Amino acid sequence: MKLQDEIVRRVQAALPDAVIELRDLTGGGDHWQAVIVSAGFEGKLPVARQRLVFGALGELMHGPIHALTLKTLTPQQAQESGR
């Protein structure tokens, strides 16, 4: 399974309604940027949202993923920002 597919699979396992935009920033598969929209972020501070995502990725954060930039939004925030 490609790393991109595994990232999406794991995030959606933790946040089943998640809509994920994922971009490989370097082409090498180790630096990623993700925009994740989920109702599961409702009522959570940004750091709690990030912990949820990093927790879902588990050991991938200690191996193939060297860096991950996150933007985590609720559906309302996504709508307000035009996403």
Predicted regions and their residues:
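Hydrophobic aliphatic residue packing
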Residues: I7, I20, I36-V37, V53
